[in-house]
């Protein structure tokens, strides 16, 4: 076993200039991640220097067998915390051989919105709070829970410590450090209200980079849970009953909101979000109706409301933002399995480009 460990941790830079690039893409469900690796002749400093590639889309539910080739375009890369050295993780989006984005490629549409001059001028910042649940592999039941049973009621677990309150911290901390190593702008972690559930935050990130970083962080997390023999779940309500669901609260601000007088801009943006509530809900993740019930720190899925420091609202404004008259707001509606390209670009489109 020690030899296997030594080989896994082998530092290639001692023997060769070649590097390994792990190409990562979103699979046919729109939430699953796939990847495969190839050897490059040497280190690269920009995605444009990476060779294009393709994969069998018929095996991922993204193309028919008689025309199965799906093409990658390389968009962003990060340092590889698993292979280390000059090796990299590459975030790709996906196209037909004719150059058309395939249906699961939501990055393409998001990039159009984020490149719009009115959006570029406002420098949109995002901070995404990604909640997730760790499950025991063989029984698909939360980590630390008795099989077929339940722990004590919620209360002691949020940001809790101790062997009877926090399960999976080694995975969480490994992920935190791996993301920092990779160059992802991960800004924190914490234990969540339901035991076995955790959260990491990415941001502030500008525009399309928020989606790239969240997907890269999700990939790293699932690779770590694979090593640990634990299952990663992004189900927005993994356990029915008196247990919190899992969301991806999305914090947002524009240049105008961050400047003096920005609170009035924030209120106008929230009003526009309310007018398009149904459209946003439809795009904010599968199964969200099981989570947005009006209980467990959520607003009812059919109701739009906002408030200061109100975690039962659709949109929460912080006390500091109200006091200072500028800042940001939090959209609490997105589910944990949301596509960050969809959510971030839709918020920008509604608040900056859409005319009621």
UniProtKB/Swiss-Prot annotation:
Enzyme class: ligase
Catalytic activity: L-glutamate + NH4(+) + ATP = L-glutamine + ADP + phosphate + H(+)
Annotated source species: Alnus glutinosa (European alder)
Tissue specificity comment: Found at highest levels in root nodules.
Name used for this protein in its record: Glutamine synthetase
Keyword Nucleotide-binding: yes
UniProt cross-references to PROSITE patterns, sorted A to Z: GLNA_1, GLNA_ATP, GS_BETA_GRASP, GS_CATALYTIC
One MF term in the entry's GO annotations: glutamine synthetase activity
Alphabetically ordered keywords of this record: ATP-binding, Cytoplasm, Ligase, Nitrogen fixation, Nucleotide-binding
E.C. numbers: 6.3.1.2
GO CC annotation terms, alphabetical: cytoplasm
Entries under PANTHER family matching the protein: GLUTAMINE SYNTHETASE (PTHR20852), GLUTAMINE SYNTHETASE CYTOSOLIC ISOZYME 1-4 (PTHR20852:SF113)
Subunit structure comment from the entry: Homooctamer.
Gene that specifies this protein: GLN1
């Amino acid at each position: 076993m020690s030899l296997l460990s030594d080989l896994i941790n082998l530092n290639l830079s001692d023997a060769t200039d070649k590097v390994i690039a792990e190409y990562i893409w979103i699979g046919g469900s729109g939430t699953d991640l796939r990847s495969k690796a190839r050897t490059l002749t040497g280190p690269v400093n920009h995605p444009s220097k990476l060779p294009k590639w393709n994969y069998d889309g018929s095996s991922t539910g993204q193309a028919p067998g008689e025309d199965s080739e799906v093409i990658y375009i390389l968009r962003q890369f990060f340092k590889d915390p698993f292979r280390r050295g000059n090796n990299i993780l590459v975030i790709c989006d996906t196209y037909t051989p004719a150059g058309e984005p395939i249906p699961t490629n939501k990055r393409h549409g998001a990039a159009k919105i984020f490149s719009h001059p009115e959006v570029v001028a406002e420098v949109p910042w995002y901070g995404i709070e990604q909640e997730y649940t760790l499950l025991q592999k063989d029984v698909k039941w939360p980590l630390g829970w008795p099989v077929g049973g339940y722990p004590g009621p919620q209360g002691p677990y949020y940001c809790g410590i101790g062997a009877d309150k926090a399960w999976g911290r080694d995975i969480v901390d490994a992920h935190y450090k791996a993301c920092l190593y990779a160059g992802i702008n991960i800004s924190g972690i914490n234990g969540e209200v339901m035991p076995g559930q955790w959260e990491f935050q990415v941001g502030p990130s500008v525009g399309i980079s928020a989606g790239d970083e969240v997907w890269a962080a999700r990939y790293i997390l699932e690779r770590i849970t694979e090593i640990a023999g634990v299952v990663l779940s992004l189900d927005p309500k993994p356990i029915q009953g008196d247990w919190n669901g899992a969301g991806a609260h999305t914090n947002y601000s524009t240049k105008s909101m961050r400047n003096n007088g920005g609170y009035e801009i924030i209120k106008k943006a929230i009003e526009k979000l309310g007018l398009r509530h149904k459209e946003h809900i439809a795009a904010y993740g599968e199964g969200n109706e099981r989570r947005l019930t009006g209980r467990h720190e959520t607003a009812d899925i059919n109701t739009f409301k906002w408030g200061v420091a109100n975690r039962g609202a659709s949109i929460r404004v912080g006390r500091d933002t109200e006091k200072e008259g500028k800042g940001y707001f939090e959209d609490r509606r997105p589910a944990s399995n949301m596509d960050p390209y969809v959510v971030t670009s839709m918020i920008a489109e509604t608040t900056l480009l859409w005319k009621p």
